[in-house]
Design a protein with these regions (language model features):
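Acidic active-site catalytic centers that drive phospho-/nucleotidyl reactions
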Residues: 44-45, 72
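Domain-length cofactor-binding catalytic modules of enzymes
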Residues: 2-28, 35-42, 48-56, 62-66, ...
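A generic, well-ordered mixed alpha/beta core segment in the N-terminal half of proteins
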Residues: 66-123
Length: 369
């Protein structure tokens, strides 16, 4: 662990390796009024993001920058444990997903019922385009979003279905609306960058309210995907874990961007990469870590770097033994080699979580960009 100090605050960094661009973003945050009075902690999977660092957790005060939560509000992983009596038909699973779960930019042709009237309930509902919102519920998206089946290493009959997705296009629109509002409000404030412009007062209250709705939307989106797959495959749910990594925990005033809650006794999942699986963990409730843990292994290559530096031959070799029809040029930027070695994460997180087991992939679906 080392510490970075700035004009308004400091950040403790729980990482062995931090790229220069991520370091610059941490320094910028510590030089921002957002850092004043905040406990800032940087997780082991830290890497540079679009305008702000990923792997961030910080306590919030009377100022919040929507960009720190990001455009995929409420993104996370829904994990469902099951024990199929007759094994898994991977060809059927792949067909079921491809035929029924839109991915990439695809959405449904018809609206999906949702318990919240977004136009009426969202404070910004009449200022954004909601035409895609109801058609996007139950869709995966692209990038690092995935559907995966992981085998338990402790129970030979046990498997975890994992779905990583978020609030889709509607979350992006909500964040964009409020970040633009923040830029307007901070336009004349000296030393406040566009990326770290913030909301206060009634505008902050409106954002927090709408963000909460988006977190619920993201949860229902993941749950719908996972639960429908369980039904189509005839799998019985035994237990589940919900792990969110782009949100504000309003009960405890903790912002997490690319980090997850690790309260004492809380089960959580840390996905590593499409070859090495995920860590099933239990939180220790470490206050110095802001009761948080990393949300993954963290990238060591940008998407463009991965596409330039990783060969298809190496990608195919890395994925041997895992059923997938998604190893292609379009997903090369998500290859295992684009991420940090998971052993680095395992070696650091012992202060904040107990690792129950590492589950290993037997099936992976990931849409190309």
């Amino acid at each position: 662990m080392f510490e970075i100090s700035g004009k308004y605050g400091s950040a403790k960094v729980y990482a062995n390796t931090v790229e220069d661009s991520a370091m610059a973003q941490i320094v910028e945050l510590c030089n921002s009024p957002l850092a004043e009075g905040s406990n800032i902690r940087i997780m082991p999977d830290v890497h540079a993001g679009s305008g702000c660092v990923i792997g961030l957790t910080m306590t919030i005060t009377d100022k919040v920058c929507p960009n720190l939560v990001g455009v995929d509000i409420g993104c996370g992983v829904e994990s469902m444990y099951f024990e199929p009596p007759d094994g898994i038909d991977f060809e059927k699973l792949d067909r079921v997903i491809r035929e029924n779960i839109p991915s990439g930019f695809a959405i449904y042709d018809k609206d999906t019922p949702f318990s919240v009237n977004l136009e009426d309930e969202l404070s910004c509902g009449k200022r954004i385009n909601l035409s895609r919102a109801y058609k996007s519920l139950g869709t995966l998206g692209g990038g690092n979003h995935f559907i995966e089946v992981n085998k338990s290493t402790k129970n030979e009959n046990g498997y975890w279905l994992m779905v990583h997705s978020g609030s889709r296009n509607v979350g992006l629109q909500v964040e964009t609306y409020y970040q633009n509002k923040a830029r307007e409000l901070c336009a004349n404030k000296k030393g406040v960058s566009k990326a770290l412009s913030y909301l206060e007062g009634k505008e902050l209250d409106a954002y927090m309210f709408d963000m909460n709705i988006m977190q619920y939307y993201a949860y229902i989106n993941r749950f719908r995907i996972a639960f429908r797959i369980m039904g189509w495959m005839g799998w019985s749910l035994i237990k589940s874990i919900t792990t969110i990594h782009n949100y504000i925990d309003q009960d405890n005033n903790v912002l997490r961007k690319g980090s997850i809650a690790a309260y004492k006794g809380e089960s959580l999942v840390i996905p590593l990469n499409m070859r090495d699986g995920s860590l099933i963990c239990v939180g220790k409730g470490n206050e110095d870590w802001n009761f948080s843990a990393p949300h993954g292994a963290g990238r060591i290559m940008s998407r463009s770097e991965a596409k330039s530096n990783v060969s298809m031959e190496d990608y195919k070799e890395a994925m041997k033994g895992i059923y997938t029809t998604c190893v292609s040029e379009s997903t090369l930027d998500e290859s295992p080699m684009a991420y940090k070695d998971f052993s680095e994460i395992e070696s650091i997180v012992g202060d904040t979580v107990d690792i129950v087991e590492r589950v290993v992939p037997v099936y992976n679906f990931k849409a190309g960009n």
